[in-house]
């Protein structure tokens, strides 16, 4: 008969406070050491769900099993329970009355004295015991959240069936091999092998059928769990999209409000004012036709200041050609070179005429009797251009 979760649970349910009960069930558990992982899982569930007194009995059973394992150098149960012993024992300690706490501490002291578990596990347990005095009962569940308990039981059950089926299959293979090797032996011996082979084969068949049924149920349950999780995932994705839409709308509204504020302050439509701004900055300053700056030539840097009087120390009443100060270099301006030379010639001609008029008598008649210049004299004097 295959070992099932119900079989293990029923065996644990018969546990009582007598030494015979604790020792007897411990021997039965040790016999099924190849199912150590599954039996430990069922023990953890029973510890979590039991009353305070039953929790203490289950811890006594664990103590008996791990101590026998240490003496007999069997590692299956110690290895199977080590990942859970801190949380499970500490949670049981936190949930029981003070009188039972004292007895659990006694079991813990035995583990420390005999080094049943590693030093790290024992130190962690000691710390959890100290914290439990202040924090009370924890929310620990031995095999995950409580809502996962049905799936965990199915997995444990399937694992038990699979191990039982594998174990009986090994027996069937060995018996069948022996049966083939002893074909020439006595018929009575062959009949004995045949009976054993039939019995083992039927047991193996039942184990595999139970395993297949349990695994199919587990797959159906997991598929249902996956569908439920997919539905929750879809709802969460829709909620995320809704939140992102709200955030996007808020950002757009803030952007619109900021643009409206800039427009009201005169900084809104920059494209409409860009042309005007460019025209105003690039247009030259307007000048009046009568302004002195309208046609003023540009002056080089060596020209005197407008407020200073140039050449003051060299000014004489009747300057002659010898004592004239040298002319400043011609300034670049709107006049051409030809116009500058004509202006200079007229200035020199005017100075020569003034000197000649000073040398003549005041009442001399330079034009004859009628004191009117002739066209020849005017032409000779340079008043007209060449005809």
Swiss-Prot record:
Q: Quote the InterPro entries the UniProt record gives.
A: CID_dom (IPR006569), ENTH_VHS (IPR008942), Rtt103-like_CID (IPR047883)
State the UniProt keywords alphabetically: Coiled coil, Phosphoprotein
Q: Which GO terms describe its molecular function?
A: molecular condensate scaffold activity; RNA polymerase II C-terminal domain binding; RNA polymerase II complex binding
Region Disordered: list its residue ranges. 257-387
CDD domains (alphabetical): CID_Rtt103
Please give the residue positions where the record annotates the modification Phosphoserine: 372
List the SMART domains: RPR
Cite the CID domain residue spans from the record: 1-133
Coiled coil (residue ranges): 177-255
> In terms of domain of life, where is this protein from?
Eukaryota
Q: Which Pfam families match?
A: CID
Q: Which Gene3D superfamilies match?
A: 1.25.40.90
* Compositional bias ranges of the Polar residues kind: 298-323
Q: Which SUPFAM superfamilies match?
A: ENTH/VHS domain
GO biological process terms held by the UniProt record: mRNA 3'-end processing
Q: Which GO terms describe its cellular component?
A: cytosol; Mei2 nuclear dot complex; nucleus
Q: Which family does it belong to?
A: Belongs to the UPF0400 (RTT103) family.
What name does UniProt use for this protein?
UPF0400 protein C337.03
* Source organism of this protein record: Schizosaccharomyces pombe (strain 972 / ATCC 24843) (Fission yeast)
């Amino acid at each position: 008969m295959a070992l099932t979760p119900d079989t293990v649970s029923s065996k644990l349910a018969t546990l009582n406070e007598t030494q015979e009960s604790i020792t007897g069930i411990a021997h039965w558990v040790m016999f099924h050491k190849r199912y150590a992982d599954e039996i430990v899982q069922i023990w953890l569930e029973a510890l979590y769900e039991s009353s305070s007194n039953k929790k203490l009995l289950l811890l006594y059973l664990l103590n008996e099993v791990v101590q026998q394992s240490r003496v007999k150098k069997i590692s299956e149960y110690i290895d199977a329970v080590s990942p859970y012993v801190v949380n499970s024992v500490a949670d049981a300690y936190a949930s029981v009355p003070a009188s039972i706490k004292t007895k659990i501490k006694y079991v813990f002291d035995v583990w420390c004295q005999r080094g049943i578990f590693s030093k790290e596990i024992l130190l962690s347990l000691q710390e959890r015991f100290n914290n439990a005095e202040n924090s009370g009962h924890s929310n620990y569940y031995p095999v995950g959240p409580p809502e996962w308990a049905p799936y965990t039981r199915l997995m444990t059950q399937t694992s038990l069936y699979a191990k039982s089926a594998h174990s009986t299959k090994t027996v069937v293979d060995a018996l069948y091999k022996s049966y083939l090797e002893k074909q020439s032996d006595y018929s009575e011996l062959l009949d004995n092998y045949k009976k054993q082979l039939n019995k083992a084969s039927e047991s193996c068949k039942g184990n595999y059928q139970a395993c297949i049924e349990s695994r199919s149920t587990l797959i159906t349950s997991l598929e249902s769990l996956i569908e439920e999780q997919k539905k929750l995932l879809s709802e969460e994705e829709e909620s995320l999209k809704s939140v992102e839409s709200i955030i996007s709308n808020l950002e757009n509204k803030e952007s619109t409000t900021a643009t409206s504020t800039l427009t009201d302050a005169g900084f809104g439509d920059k494209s409409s004012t860009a042309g005007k701004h460019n025209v105003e900055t690039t247009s030259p300053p307007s000048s009046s036709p009568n302004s002195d700056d309208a046609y003023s030539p540009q002056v080089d840097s060596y020209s005197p200041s407008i407020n200073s009087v140039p050449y003051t120390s060299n000014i004489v009443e009747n300057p002659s050609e010898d004592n004239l100060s040298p002319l400043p270099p011609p300034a670049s301006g709107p006049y051409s070179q030809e116009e500058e030379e004509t202006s200079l010639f007229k200035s020199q001609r005017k100075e020569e005429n003034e000197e000649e008029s000073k040398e003549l008598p005041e009442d001399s008649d330079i034009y004859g009797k009628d004191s009117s210049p002739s066209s020849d004299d005017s032409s000779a004097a340079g008043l007209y251009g060449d005809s």
